[in-house]
């Protein structure tokens, strides 16, 4: 009889859907519960990963990179993580594991965590929580403490007009109508001669330029250095006074010092290594090198003298670099670690042509009285860089002194054509002069600006490039 009842039940199709649903209900509830709890756990993991990212980045911000105590760095990262990781649906706020690795100026932070997401269906899954974990790594190099040695060319060639209009006006107002010294007439350079009367003049070309409000290249260099040390209106951080250097020091939370020099036949000290603000006081003292008169640099010149002959000269770039090299100490990493010292950086601003009395002239042939006019001999640059010192070069391009309506030069300069033009071809941007200066600079730290260009902007951009550092999230 039981057997018959079972057979009737098997053949009966009434209520089959309800029975099948009842049989499937248990696994469906299990799957729905597991899916809901798993989805909530993944959401918690994403939020905790974001907290770990924020904590890792916070620990490599510029302000933290100056902190040498790992416990302070870890506490900062932990506080940021805790503020963002206090989420509902966790059994407790997780305590992160924070690993700090410093290598020189580089710091790597790893923030990892393990948390328990509370399950809504603990009986279905057979456990109260679902474990989630994750980590974030951030790496940054702190902006190093740096000493900057600003080396500005003040030789007579830096007295050229700043723009083509200035050059044209200089040539115009040094004509015989305005300049009685024949050797200084029709000249695009505002040479500063202390004994212009020797040549029959009453005022030198520099005095004429000042009287006519003609801007010179050295004026633009002075303005650029002033922006670097004294006044910059574009600092993105409020409350910072001073120039670009002070602004970048504040942004990078680091220390910069500056020394200010000019050079011609030798090195001229305007400010030894000090704060940028103190060095900035001396910017107004940047001025053109004076000469006694044409073809006589110093009083007492003589054709028989080996050091003060009767010829024009006045630019010893390699000599200035050698003198700076003797002043600069061995560079450090620039960290705040005990015993470490700042990095050392030379900023060279020049038109790139040496004009000096020398026993050797490796890049050119001698003119009269052992006068060597040549592109920079980079031997000293190599010596400095081999010490681990960086060199940044701003090339104020040597204008091609060839008659041209474009440049405003009315007459081709025969001296230029004889001694300089071959190094200034095919253009001032690509000739041997430019190539030598680029070879002198450390990789990536070279810039050039043509006559009439923005020297202030070029020097500012070059400095920011040297001083910049970044932090990045690795994973």
Where are these regions (language model features)?
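Short glycine-rich loop/turn motifs that provide flexible caps or phosphate-binding loops at active sites
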Residues: 14, 32, 351
């Amino acid at each position: 009889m039981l057997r018959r009842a079972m057979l009737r039940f098997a053949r009966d199709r009434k209520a089959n859907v309800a029975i099948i649903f009842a049989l499937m209900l248990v696994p469906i509830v299990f799957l729905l519960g597991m899916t809901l709890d798993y989805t909530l756990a993944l959401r918690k993991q994403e939020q905790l990963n974001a907290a770990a990212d924020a904590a890792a980045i916070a620990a490599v911000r510029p302000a933290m990179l100056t902190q040498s105590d790992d416990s302070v760095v870890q506490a900062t990262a932990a506080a940021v993580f805790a503020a963002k990781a206090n989420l509902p649906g966790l059994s407790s706020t997780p305590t992160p594991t924070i690993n700090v690795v410093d290598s020189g100026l580089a710091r790597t932070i790893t923030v990892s965590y393990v948390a328990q997401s509370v399950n809504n269906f603990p009986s279905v899954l057979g456990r109260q929580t679902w474990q989630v974990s994750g980590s974030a790594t951030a790496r940054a190099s702190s902006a190093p403490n740096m000493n900057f040695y600003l080396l500005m060319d003040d030789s007579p060639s830096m007295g050229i007009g700043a723009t083509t209009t200035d050059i044209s006006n200089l040539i115009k107002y040094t004509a015989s109508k305005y300049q009685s010294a024949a050797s200084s007439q029709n000249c695009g350079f505002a040479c500063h001669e202390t004994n212009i009367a020797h040549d029959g003049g009453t005022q030198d070309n520099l005095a004429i330029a000042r009287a006519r409000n003609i801007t010179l290249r050295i004026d633009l260099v002075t303005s650029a250095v002033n922006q670097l040390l004294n006044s910059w209106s574009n600092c993105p951080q409020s409350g910072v006074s001073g120039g670009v250097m002070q602004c970048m020091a504040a942004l990078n939370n680091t220390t910069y010092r500056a020394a200010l020099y000019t050079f011609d036949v030798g090195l001229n000290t305007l400010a030894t290594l000090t704060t940028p603000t103190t060095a900035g006081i001396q910017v107004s003292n940047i001025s053109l090198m004076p000469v006694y008169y044409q073809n006589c640099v110093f009083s007492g010149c003589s054709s028989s003298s080996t050091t003060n002959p009767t010829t024009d000269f006045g630019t010893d770039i390699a000599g200035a670099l050698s003198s700076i090299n003797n002043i600069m100490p061995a560079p450090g990493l620039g960290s705040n670690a005990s015993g470490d010292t700042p990095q050392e950086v030379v900023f060279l601003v020049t038109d790139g042509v040496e004009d000096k009395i020398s026993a050797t002239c490796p890049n050119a042939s001698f003119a009269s009285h052992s006068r060597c006019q040549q592109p920079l001999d980079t031997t000293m640059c190599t010596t400095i860089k081999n010490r681990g010192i960086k060199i940044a070069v701003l090339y104020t391009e040597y204008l091609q002194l060839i008659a041209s309506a474009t440049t405003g030069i009315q007459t081709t300069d025969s001296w230029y054509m004889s001694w300089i033009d071959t190094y200034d071809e095919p253009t001032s941007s690509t000739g041997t002069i430019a190539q030598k200066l680029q070879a002198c600079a450390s990789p990536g730290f070279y810039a050039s600006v043509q006559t009439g260009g923005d020297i202030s902007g070029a020097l500012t951009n070059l400095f920011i490039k040297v001083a910049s550092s970044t932090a990045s999230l690795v994973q």
